[in-house]
Amino acid sequence: MELQVVGANALTVSETTFGREFNEALIHQVVVAYAAGARQGSRAQKTRAEVSGSGKKPWRQKGTGRARSGDIKSPIWRSGGVTFAAKPQDHSQKVNKKMYRGAIKSILSELVRQDRLIVVEKFEVEAPKTKVLVQKLKELALEDVLIITASLDENLFLAARNLYKVDVRDVQGIDPVSLIAFDKVVVTVDAVKQIEEMLA
């Protein structure tokens, strides 16, 4: 199959990478796993066994008129332990390489079908200036956009850093979540070739 390149000849690409069927279930599973892996999972509370303090009975069982009490670390006391204390947890989910690559291929194929994948010969800015990039994006009628280059261009990265809904990644930095988060995806010809090699 062929992808149209802005201002140049069409680029022949692999059908298996850019012409796959849309697999919503696979994409959902991979995106959920990706988001789960980003969770910190470090919350921690203390049970009554872990709270610092004496284990001595505060006052005798009977005769004081007060409610009976056996431990100042009781969960019903102020500063006591937590009944079902939260503990650090690993939320990560296992995703096979084949599934992960399949999800990215499926997303790229859907972007092509929806005309949301724009292939350009190259995408550069002369200086790390936001206004230079804004002008370039205006010329291409782009606002909400992910720009993927073969290698990370520092000028382009710095120019895009302060722009809302504009992100710059190299091929190694793409993931399913970023691919579906933007309205349009701009990819350079060299990046397309690298993506094909990476997902082969």
Curated annotation (Swiss-Prot):
Say if the entry is tagged with keyword Ligase: no
Q: Which GO terms describe its cellular component?
A: ribonucleoprotein complex; ribosome
| A Pfam cross-reference name | Ribosomal_L4
Which GO-annotated molecular functions does the record name? Answer: rRNA binding; structural constituent of ribosome
Give the signal peptide, or none: none
What keywords tag this UniProt record? Ribonucleoprotein, Ribosomal protein, RNA-binding, rRNA-binding
UniProt region (Disordered), positions on chain: 43-71
Q: Which residues form a coiled coil?
A: none
Q: Which InterPro entries match?
A: Ribosomal_uL4, Ribosomal_uL4-like, Ribosomal_uL4_dom_sf
BP-aspect Gene Ontology terms: translation
By sequence similarity, the record places it as follows: Belongs to the universal ribosomal protein uL4 family.
UniProt-listed HAMAP family: Ribosomal_uL4_B
* Subunit structure and binding partners: Part of the 50S ribosomal subunit.
Role played: One of the primary rRNA binding proteins, this protein initially binds near the 5'-end of the 23S rRNA. It is important during the early stages of 50S assembly. It makes multiple contacts with different domains of the 23S rRNA in the assembled 50S subunit and ribosome.
Q: What is this protein called?
A: Large ribosomal subunit protein uL4
What organism does the record attribute this protein to? Pasteurella multocida (strain Pm70)
Q: Which gene encodes it?
A: rplD
